[in-house]
Amino acid sequence: MECSWLRAVALVAVLVGLHGCATGMTARDRSSPSATVTLVHLNDVYEILPVEGGKSGGLARVATVVQALKAAHPAVLTTLGGDYLSPSALGTARIDGQPLAGRQMVDVLNATGLDVATLGNHEFDVSEAAFRSHLVQSKFRIVSTNVTDAGDKPFPGVPTSLIVPITSGPRSLRIGFVGVTIDSTRKPWVRYRDAIASARAELEALRGKVDAVVALTHLSLEQDAQFVEAVPGIDLVLGGHEHENWLMYRGPRFVPVVKADANARSVAIVTLSFGAPGERPSIAVRLQKIDDTIAATPAVDAVARAWVEKAFDGFRREGFSPEAVVATITEPLDGRESTVRNRAGRLTDLIASALAREADPVDVALFNGGSVRIDDVVPPGPITEYDIIRILPFGGRIVKATLDGALLSRVLEIGLANEGLGGFLHASGARREDGAWLVQGRAIDPGRRYSVALTDFLLSGGETNLGFLTRANPAVRDVRELRDIRRAVIEELRREVLTR
């Protein structure tokens, strides 16, 4: 089957989309390899059950793929390129007074048979206590070359590099792993070392001790390209952070950089073929779509569903009815990250309308695309309260405030410039026309005060490039807290159906 080509980006010599590829793409041909090792890679997994109405993903299906590969050839390792503790709708459920905060993810990944992972930036969304607890809970190995605790020491059980012995036929091989993470989530209890310098030091320590070096990365695509160019000696990069699959080759050694689709919609299957000892392995990559044609492994599925029921009990105690049908929708609601961080759509319009109605009367309603975490399309049909929790897992209150026109104009302009980021803003009541911002059809008056509905997070100053948007800003006045945004969206959906 032919592989489809994806967009070219700066600093990338060759970028190939993996969608639908059934044939391998080989960095260097070698006849009759004497040993092979297969790596099954996934990244950015927040859901333990299938997504897209059950059509795609599901860790129990991933387990089936891994087991089938091991049955044919036992030398198989399963890897994860970070982002698994958060953000997750189930992770916000409280059990015994504490949020799950990824506990369910670790348990299901343990059952799936994950071998090696690195840390993603969203691992640090949870509390330090929860993070450290999950390290103990994990049966898989975690490697992190550039992330330490506040004392600049590795977290317990998280080495800066890792050597995994594996037997392939008559050969005993040693695969070296390093792991690096983007420094985008800053917490007092986390420190980031320079990824390139840290990896170079670890590769020097691994020299002569391993048959291949694999870098597990949670970096942007551009950073991955720079990383491979700057760190010689890496044979393969298995990445994360992007939520869509990528394959690119970089550097003088034509090193593959591989990413799968988020939420286990696909896994990358990478075969390392070893010839004579000391020679670089040849590498072949293919994408395996994870969908409803693959049976779920019953034991893993049972673990996942048990956690869903525990989480649902937690939501019920908070006053939600997760299985209750809110409405029957006739159009899909697109909550994919690639959509909500770049343009408006049916879902974002619905959320903005819910904010405006909750704060009525109001001139403008604003929220950040990054608050939508479902990274999925809700198909036409019944939509439940749990679907709304999946869409907005962080919840938070809607707030109504008065903003000076100059500040509102600045916020809107930066929100538009944040295209592609979580800080891309969606608005009701405001639009840009001929280079100027209009509110309720009229140009913003810098000296006028406007009533604005927004989320408490957006008013915390925590969003990208919007650190000035806080309650302490003198141009922000009359702040009043309203209901949880999820309650307002549930009510807005019900109202839309009734008035159709």
Give, region by region, the residue ranges found by the protein language model.
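Alpha-helical protein-protein interaction elements
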Residues: 11, 113-116, 386, 442
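Non-catalytic terminal accessory segments
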Residues: 15, 20-36, 40-42, 46, ...
